[in-house]
UniProtKB/Swiss-Prot annotation:
It comes from Arabidopsis thaliana. Induction: Up-regulated by aluminum. The STOP1 transcription factor is required for MATE expression. It holds the Pfam family MatE. GO terms for biological process: citrate transport; monoatomic ion transmembrane transport; response to aluminum ion. Residues 1-35, 80-168, 233-242, 288-312, 371-390, 445-453, 502-515 are cytoplasmic. The keyword Transmembrane applies. The chain crosses the membrane at residues 36-56, 59-79, 169-189, 212-232, 243-263, 267-287, 313-333, 350-370, 391-411, 424-444, 454-474, 481-501. This is Protein DETOXIFICATION 42. It is a multi-pass membrane protein. Acts in parallel but independently of ALMT1, an aluminum-activated root malate transporter. Belongs to the multi antimicrobial extrusion (MATE) (TC 2.A.66.1) family.
């Protein structure tokens, strides 16, 4: 039986039922559907804004020259790779911890307000005013007296700032990690670039080192911004991060041509524009956050550094496992030759870009689930997991149809080479056909994080990576290009399977499904 809130009030004993519960209501805009949409849509838009801005950024840099474009490309790849190690654990953990603390704090405030109202004789704690004039005399009062009597109404006290220790912890950790990353990349820029294949006598070395060193100055702003985004996600507010992201990206796009062409700063101007935009974005997010959270009035005993570091290490292992699988597949494609690498890169970028849309549902699921688990509202937890997984599956099928048709006719946008186009057509069935599996795998990530099941999420992904690496090595050696895509299909299928197994067996935080 469905409640008006959008979740099933009957609690089945078979955990597998959660995947099929109320599937007919998957697109219904009830209370739960609207809450998911309010979180998922801005989150997906914010996630897609940065890649679009990067494309525009790349277009401006490409006007300087091919050497500068290649140099900046290597520097950006290195910067993003180092950043990813810290970003993913920081944002994921912050979202869950803040959502849990905010839910518990709201419950405590409700109970405290209820007790205070009972003590002063108010039966309904939600009333904003106390009636001072008997009902039977209201009709005889003049309008003037009614107006003047309103001064006796009890007004609401000003809203207090939230006291969320995890928010302060995340910002401190983000700031420290950002400073460490900046020092590391600036001091080790030359050897790191050499490791990436840029030789010391290459014409790319000087512009790539200059760009990386300047870009690294923005690392503290990047990590602080993402920590703040994690806090807002925990509050189920993805609109504020979207606003800050758009402002920052637009600023970057405006400053790029000014610094690059008007001031003739070249690569230096591109890096400077990016750093300015990052600090602007960081400033907006911190300003908005300080209006809602008391981030400074926090004793050290309430900060949760140990909890952050423990779960952060688990997710770090997970990030390394995921990154290694994708990097290995690209490396194996490169060994097949430039034609295979070009086709693989086009297919891979399209394959990964579509995941950003599914990540919107993952963010929504994580925030709502973390709040529900903190309140021990297991019916809402089950309903939320069911709904976001079903929405992810529907999205996957829609993307499969769009990519199946779009990439078939639009592949020439990426290349004119007939050999590359032929290989893209071979990879197309995998890119399009795996979209439902990919979407489920990414949404399962959000579901696991929302349940604070970080240990299982890390351990299962490491096991998946080991099996997938063996499959990639074997299949690429026996079947070449198509073998790589068979291997990646196995990898994503296993990622979805371990998520399905955890909930379907009713183990870990999902044991309530069996009770």
């Amino acid at each position: 039986m469905m409640s008006e809130d959008g979740y099933n009030t009957d609690f089945p004993r078979n955990p597998l039922y959660i995947f099929f519960s109320d599937f007919r209501s998957v697109l219904k805009f009830d209370e739960l559907g609207l809450e998911i949409a309010r979180i998922a849509l801005p989150a997906a838009l914010a996630l897609t804004a940065d890649p679009i801005a990067s494309l525009v950024d790349t277009a401006f840099i490409g006007q300087i020259g091919p050497v500068e474009l290649a140099a900046v490309g290597v520097s950006i790849a290195l910067f993003n790779q180092v950043s990813r190690i810290a970003i993913f654990p920081l944002v994921s953990i912050t979202t869950s911890f803040v959502a849990e603390e905010d839910a518990c704090s709201s419950q405590q405030d409700t109970v405290r307000d209820h007790k205070e109202c009972i003590e002063i004789g108010i039966n309904n704690p939600t009333e904003e005013t106390i009636e001072l004039i008997p009902e039977k005399h209201k009709d005889s009062l003049s309008d003037e007296f009614k107006t003047s009597s309103s001064i006796f109404s009890i007004s609401k006290p000003p809203a207090k700032k939230r006291n969320i220790p995890s928010a302060s912890s995340a910002l401190i950790i983000g700031g420290v990690l950002g400073l460490f990353q900046a020092v590391f990349l600036i001091s080790a820029a030359k050897p790191l670039l050499s490791f990436m294949g840029v030789k010391h006598d290459s014409p790319m070395m000087r512009p790539s080192q200059r760009y990386l060193s300047l870009r690294s100055l923005g690392a503290p702003a990047v990590l602080l911004s993402l920590a703040a985004q994690g806090v807002f996600r925990g509050f189920k507010d993805t609109t504020t991060p979207l606003f800050a992201t758009v402002i920052g990206d637009v600023t970057n796009i405006i400053l790029d041509p000014i610094f690059i062409f008007v001031f003739r700063l070249g690569v230096t101007g591109a890096a400077t524009a990016h750093v300015i935009s990052q600090y602007l974005m960081c400033g907006i997010l911190l300003w908005k956050l300080m209006g809602q959270v008391d981030i400074f009035n926090m004793s050290t005993k309430h900060l949760q550094f140990c909890r952050f570091m423990k779960n952060g290490f688990l997710l770090l292992m997970r990030v390394i496992a995921v990154t290694f699988c994708v990097t290995l597949s690209a490396s194996l494609a490169a060994r097949e030759g430039s034609t295979s690498m070009a086709a693989f890169q086009v297919c891979l970028q399209v394959w990964l870009a579509t995941s950003l849309l599914a990540d919107g549902y993952a963010v929504a699921g994580q925030a709502i689930l973390a709040s529900a688990f903190a309140k021990k509202d297991y019916k809402r937890a089950a309903a939320t997991a069911s709904r976001v997984l079903q929405l992810g599956l529907v999205l996957g099928f829609v993307l499969a149809v769009i990519l199946g048709a779009g990439l078939h006719f639009g592949a020439r946008v990426f290349t004119k080479d007939d050999k590359v186009l032929h290989l893209i057509s071979i990879g197309l069935p995998f890119v399009a056909g795996t979209q439902p599996i990919n979407a489920l795998a990414f949404v399962f990530d959000g579901v696991n994080f929302g349940a604070s099941d970080f240990g299982y999420a890390a351990a299962s992904l490491v096991m998946v990576a080991i099996v997938s690496i063996l499959c990639l090595l074997f299949l690429s050696s026996t079947h070449g290009f198509i073998g790589l895509w068979f291997g990646l299909t196995i990898y994503m299928s296993l990622r979805a399977a371990v998520g399905f197994w955890r909930i379907g067996t009713g183990t870990g935080p999902w044991s309530f499904l069996r009770s």
